[in-house]
A protein has these predicted regions:
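Fungal secretory targeting signals
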Residues: 1-24
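Fungal extracellular Ser/Thr-rich, low-complexity intrinsically disordered regions
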Residues: 17-35, 194, 199-211
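Short, well-ordered surface patches within globular domains
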Residues: 33-89
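Active-site rim elements
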Residues: 36-38, 57-58, 99-102, 127, ...
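Solvent-exposed loop/turn segments at secondary-structure junctions
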Residues: 51-53, 68, 77-78, 96-98, ...
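A solvent-exposed, acidic/Ser-Thr-rich amphipathic alpha-helical stretch
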Residues: 85-111
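Disulfide-stabilized extracellular recognition modules
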Residues: 108-211
């Protein structure tokens, strides 16, 4: 992975532009977190998935606003603890919740990259599901093609872990049927993405809804 350091620098250092959305009411503690259609938020999530999926020979994902809206609705329920509401989901939470817009973007970025860190636990010689690596396997599941995510701030006086980040995937990964993990979770054996590709995807107006 000769270009890993250069690519990682690009992925981390991409500028965060000022939020462009209009503030809209929703059923959460406040509205400081970026909305699910925010380009900075989408870019932070998608660059992480794009990079790691390329290394694991998985197809590029496209952003699905319907999945993102579903993730936002489920976060808005503000269950006491974060809960998987459906198959094909990855969740992260933070306490205390991020305090400003830029911190929410960083939360989404670091959580997305953090899911890949579970790869060190994954037994390639005995592929199967366990919670210890379930975020990683969903992230790189090869026939998953679409993703939508959201963040939200639940009332810290009513819930634990009020800062929440949910991603929903289609097709859902972590299928425990015989042979699925062997077929869908490959090691990091494919070539690094090029620096040029990373630069293109660092642009704020990059269209993640298309391959």
């Amino acid at each position: 992975m000769k270009s890993f350091i250069t690519l990682a620098t690009l992925l981390v250092a991409s500028a965060v532009a000022a939020p462009s959305h209009n503030v809209k009411p929703r059923e959460l503690y406040n509205d400081d977190a970026p909305h699910a259609d925010d380009p900075n938020f989408i870019g932070a999530v998608m660059r992480a998935h794009w990079f790691w999926r390329r290394l694991h020979c998985a197809q590029d994902l496209v952003w699905d606003q319907g999945l993102a809206d579903a993730a936002r609705r489920d976060i808005s329920e503000c269950t006491y603890m974060p809960e998987h509401m459906r198959s094909g989901s990855n969740l992260s939470s933070q306490k205390p919740a991020p305090s400003k817009y830029e911190d929410w973007i960083e939360f989404a970025r670091t959580a997305s990259h953090g899911w890949h860190e579970e790869e060190t636990k994954y037994p390639y010689d005995h592929p199967h599901y366990e919670d210890a690596w379930g975020h990683f396997t969903q992230m790189v599941w090869r026939n998953t093609s679409r993703i939508g995510c959201a963040v939200g701030y639940c009332n810290p006086e009513q819930v634990d872990w009020p800062g929440r980040f949910y991603c929903y995937y289609d097709y859902a990964g972590n299928n425990i049927a015989t042979g699925q993990f062997e077929a869908q979770v490959w090691g990091p054996v494919c070539s690094d993405p090029s620096v040029g590709e990373a630069i293109k995807r660092s642009e704020i107006d990059y269209d993640w809804s298309r391959k």
